[in-house]
Amino acid sequence: MSELAVGKKAPSFTGINTQGVKRKLSELVGEKGLVLYFYPKDNTPGCTTEACDFRDNYENLKKLGFNVVGVSRDDEKSHKKFTEKQNLNFELISDVSGEICEKYGVWQEKVFMGKKSMGIVRTTFLIDSSLKILKIYPKVSVKGHVMQIMKDIEELSK
């Protein structure tokens, strides 16, 4: 994997969405860009809070020209249940193999309650319409994250 950095091209990928349809990165980008966020697991407290925050601000992000897509290693059946339960209005991409997570460098060793394990480190990438990375948000804290993204999009648009 090449080093991901602001100004570099976002790694291309093809993933399966909630409806079982193959979607390419290039098909997911909005008029001005994409908010691509990686999260550990469907229907867990932090991931639900984050997804609902994106859901509640989706129209505002669309007005700014950005689409939202979430990626985790859950399968499409899990994503479908999560989408229905939380009434999500954006696509989730299933990365069961972990290939997309590896390309974006978010599959890492984590420590929880003293135990080490591999997992997705909550990370968001702001990508422009030409698929260049505008901003990387590593080790995301859920609270206030979506508001920060919208603020950053507005700043970058000036």
Give residue ranges: language-model regions.
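Chalcogenol-based redox active-site neighborhoods
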Residues: 1-158
